[in-house]
């Protein structure tokens, strides 16, 4: 009976609940866990639902985030579900990437319709690259008028479309988290329908091994008689011995061939995403490469200096700055393994940014970094983290 738990054959998908505070995200999360436990008791653990709301603190890049993780399974998939209870926690979580979501359930109370935070969360989901949203119209048991429900649904679909999601096709499921928790069969079925929609509509994530190879360089050294070795943790993709690679960032792009791959002093034929390894590079001297560059599949990523970003600035209590900053502020931007100085330009109409704020900004780095949309970074001042952000678009 218990064997099903250890099946590693199912796709693993990370999802989350997003939406306005008090629209019932946490109650719905609890309802999903309970309904799936009752439906597939051999696949799911029973949980105490108070434990979802008392979210443990997590630290990501020096930022404290209250966030709770729940695991559950349907017949098709294994899910890790993240619920960030507070609005500020949700924003920090999205920007630091503390929980990368493959898809999200936008929770909208049928009694209220989309509110200011609903909009903000959808916008942020688009900016940080959440690939898929569907909608749980929660508290639907409290609305008797079918036409009113249709109206709210239309409004939510328009909101999704306005932010670049598929508002026409996204499933909108009418649910009641509270009634499902209480065991009301009509509403239990609504939560089952919601999870069936998640199974069907959130695409299987492309796992990191299927993407083009990328390894940030952490260290460079020379092995006498063999050449230059760079070490680091492969971020994505796979790399076979004798492959051509490019070294990108900080300096002009260099091409070379990987003539050896080592892990813990053992020779390997291939390096895989997630592994710490050393790569022996043909024809390069120790001074040709440095920490902060990346080893990549040729043509898969390009170096850039100017970009737009969405940034969270730490509050004083979180160990951040004590005072605001203005345009032309010059901190360090920590990408993957290195700091690069950059100059900040604030958007028109924003005169200054206070500690604890979430803001858009344009950044010009003094050296190019291998960059793509969605890449996370920390903002540092004298080695301590004062903010965290994501690249939303590349300028040059």
Swiss-Prot record:
It comes from Paenarthrobacter aurescens (strain TC1). Residues 138-141 are annotated as: G4. It catalyses: GTP + H2O = GDP + phosphate + H(+). Residues 83-86 are annotated as: G3. Residues 10-206 form the tr-type G domain. This is Elongation factor Tu. Monomer. Residues 19-26 are annotated as: G1. Keywords: Cytoplasm, Elongation factor, GTP-binding, Hydrolase, Magnesium, Metal-binding, Nucleotide-binding, Protein biosynthesis. One of its GO terms (cellular component) is cytosol. The keyword Transit peptide does not apply. Mg(2+) binds at residue 26. GTP binds at residues 19-26, 83-87, 138-141. Residues 62-66 are annotated as: G2. It comes from the Bacteria. Pfam families: GTP_EFTU, GTP_EFTU_D2, GTP_EFTU_D3. Residues 176-178 are annotated as: G5.
């Amino acid at each position: 009976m218990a064997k099903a738990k250890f099946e590693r054959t199912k796709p693993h998908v990370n999802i989350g609940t997003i939406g306005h505070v008090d629209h019932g995200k946490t109650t719905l999360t609890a309802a999903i866990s309970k309904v799936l436990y009752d439906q597939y008791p051999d696949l799911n653990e029973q949980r105490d639902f108070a434990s979802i709301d008392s979210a443990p603190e997590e630290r990501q890049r020096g930022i404290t985030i209250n966030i709770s993780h729940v695991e559950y399974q349907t017949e098709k998939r294994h899910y890790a579900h993240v619920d960030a209870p507070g609005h500020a926690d949700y924003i920090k979580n999205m920007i630091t990437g503390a929980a990368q979501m493959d898809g999200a359930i936008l929770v909208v109370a049928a009694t209220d319709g989309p509110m200011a935070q609903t909009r903000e969360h959808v916008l942020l989901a688009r900016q940080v690259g959440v690939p898929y949203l569907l909608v749980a119209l929660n508290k639907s048991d409290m609305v008797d008028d079918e036409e009113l429900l249709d109206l709210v649904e239309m409004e939510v679909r328009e909101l999704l479309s306005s932010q670049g999601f598929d508002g026409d096709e996204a499933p909108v499921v009418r649910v009641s988290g509270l009634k499902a928790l209480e065991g009301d069969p009509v509403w239990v079925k609504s939560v089952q329908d919601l999870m069936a929609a998640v199974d069907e509509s959130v695409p299987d994530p492309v796992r990191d091994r299927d993407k083009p190879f990328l390894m940030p360089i952490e260290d460079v050294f020379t092995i006498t008689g063999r050449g230059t070795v760079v070490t680091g943790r492969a971020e994505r993709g796979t790399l076979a011995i004798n492959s051509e690679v490019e070294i990108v960032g900080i300096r002009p792009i260099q091409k070379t061939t990987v003539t050896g791959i080592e892990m813990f002093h053992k020779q390997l034929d291939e390096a895989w995403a997630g592994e710490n390894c050393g790569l022996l590079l043909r024809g390069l001297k120790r001074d040709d490469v440095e920490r902060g560059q990346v080893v990549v599949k040729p043509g898969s990523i390009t170096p850039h200096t100017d970009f737009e970003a969405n940034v969270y600035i730490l509050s004083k209590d979180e160990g951040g700055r004590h005072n605001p900053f203005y345009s032309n502020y010059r901190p360090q931007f920590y990408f993957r393994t290195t700091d690069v100085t950059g100059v900040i330009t604030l958007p028109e109409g924003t005169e200054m940014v206070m500690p604890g704020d979430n803001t858009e900004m344009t950044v010009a780095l003094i050296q190019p970094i291998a960059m793509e949309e969605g890449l996370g970074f920390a903002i540092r001042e004298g080695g301590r983290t004062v903010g965290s952000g994501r690249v939303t678009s590349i300028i040059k």
